[in-house]
Curated annotation (Swiss-Prot):
It comes from the Bacteria. Residues 11-26 have a biased composition (Low complexity). Keywords: Bacterial flagellum biogenesis. The keyword DNA-binding does not apply. It comes from Salmonella typhimurium (strain LT2 / SGSC1412 / ATCC 700720). This is Basal-body rod modification protein FlgD.
Length: 232
């Protein structure tokens, strides 16, 4: 914002002003408005009688301070709304504690209890498709990269789908306890599609980070709410 003062006018009181394209800002809208009015009064007092400030110029300068004040109020309002949204998201995130979620990842855990007759259980796995597929295949490998099972899932619609592996290898034997990897391929009419594998994780807590609320997934680290594809 600029307010011109005739620097050669002998009645110039020495009020600090800006000329040309310079700008002046206050710490907030109230300070800026006070400074603006002070300078405007000084300009009116010190204006050249042969070239007085025109009404349209005065209107323009008053409109400028109104705009700045309005923007300051708008920023305050937006800040309050943003805070309410953050609080709402924090509350939403805390409701997930203790729940299982499907997030992007390739891990399946297999385990069998020590008691007699216990069966092997596995964590769910899933896939997210942006387009429908007429052929979807899941390949499970062990920590050494050896294929232990290939699952022909078949046709799937676009969206998120969740499955459970029975923990058996191709030969029908049960896999040892441990961590396994899942790779998923999808195609439609012979054209390869993007297939995002999903892994299961248990939400153990919620923390606040620079990117917002973070879900604590234990050994899987942390993730944002945006990464959650399904709640189980």
């Amino acid at each position: 914002m600029s307010i011109a003062v005739n620097m050669n006018d002998p009645t110039n009181t020495g009020v600090k002003t800006t000329t040309g394209s310079g700008s002046m800002t206050g710490s907030n809208a109230a300070d800026l408005q006070s400074s603006f009015l002070t300078l405007l009064v000084a300009q009116l007092k010190n204006q050249d009688p042969t070239n007085p400030l025109q009404n349209n110029e005065l209107t323009t300068q008053l409109a400028q301070i109104s705009t700045v004040s309005g923007i300051e109020k708008l920023n305050t309002t937006l800040g309050a709304i943003s805070g309410q949204i953050d609080n709402s998201q924090s509350l939403q995130a805390t409701t997930l504690i203790g729940h299982g979620v499907m997030v992007p990842g390739t891990t399946i855990l297999a385990g069998k209890g020590a008691e007699e007759g216990a069966v092997t259980s596995t964590t769910p796995f899933g896939v997210e498709l942006q387009q429908p597929a007429d052929k979807v295949t899941a390949t499970i490998t062990d920590k050494d990269g050896r294929v232990v099972r290939t699952l022909e899932i078949g046709e799937l619609r676009a969206g998120v789908h969740t499955f459970t592996w029975d923990g058996k290898q191709t030969d029908g034997t049960t896999v040892p306890n441990g961590s396994y990897n899942i790779a998923i391929t999808a195609s439609n009419g012979g054209t390869q599609l993007v297939a995002q594998p999903l892994q299961f994780a248990l939400v153990q807590g919620v923390t606040k980070g620079s990117n917002g609320n973070l879900l604590d997934l234990g050994t899987y680290g942390t993730t944002t709410l945006d990464e959650v594809r399904q709640i189980i």
